Amino acid sequence: MKLTIATRKSKLAQVQTELIINVLKDKYGISSEKLLMETLGDKILDKSLADIGGKGLFIKDIERILLEDKADAAVHSMKDVPFEVPDMFEIAAVTLRVDVRDVFVSRDGTHFKDLKNGAVIGTSSNRRAAQLKMLRDDIKVVPIRGNVQTRIRKMGEEKLDGIILAAAGLKRLNMENIITDYFSVEEMIPAVGQGALGVEIKKENKNRDLFRKLDNKNSRMCVEAERSFMRTLNGDCHSTIGAYAEIVNGQMNVLGFYEIDGRRVKKDVSGNIEDYMSLGKTLAEKILEDK
């Protein structure tokens, strides 16, 4: 048996898919090949993601391939997966999460705290831009789209003082050496699902049980708590929303960030792990009540 795993064409997407392929081979002796896709979100880089499709922009084209049985599964960054997965699909596995933090990459090595007044930082994430303003109101934020390598190139070409990226992606690309500063999860609450990979399949997939074996229970619960938070706020991966759930001593702690009507609100809740879905919802309601 040889499986076909669909993913985006970017180097990071391929590296992430190879992680899944290697587990399938090493643990279960099953070979797989990649099917590379260029999604609409990859093709159009001169517009914001919100302007060209909104929810699920990086996912829909790949789901079509699954529907046509041209691939057995797809690997996504969980932060790109909308909270509503179409009925014919399921996220069979959420992998063990890696570093969830956002990082600052400086063009000239200057640390974030030492940036000059009015420094220009690139990010197309509303979530990152809003939290940057909470840390340093003087900073000017400009949009920057593309894969990791493209953003780094644009930083130099456009003479930006720095850019904000996800630690997980840089580490998976073995590019940790370019990181200037790490933001704590309190300073910059991550995107929902950041640092975790998701394996998506058709529900009637004959290899469903195999793919489900790749699931990490704790990562799944944390990511689902965050997605419950996003669902309650009716957000997507372009909304000004961040959430981070972690399990500490048998308890789940959830941090949430939301910008509403120009106000930026951060809150947290804690509770039993078994209540992970309701914790995300409770946190969202707590934020909405903060008027």
Swiss-Prot record:
Protein's UniProt keywords contain Transferase: yes
Catalytic activity, as annotated: 4 porphobilinogen + H2O = hydroxymethylbilane + 4 NH4(+)
Annotated positions of the S-(dipyrrolylmethanemethyl)cysteine modification: 237
This enzyme's EC code(s): 2.5.1.61
GO cellular component, one term: cytoplasm
Keywords: Porphyrin biosynthesis, Transferase
Quaternary assembly: Monomer.
UniProt name for this protein: Porphobilinogen deaminase
Gene designation: hemC
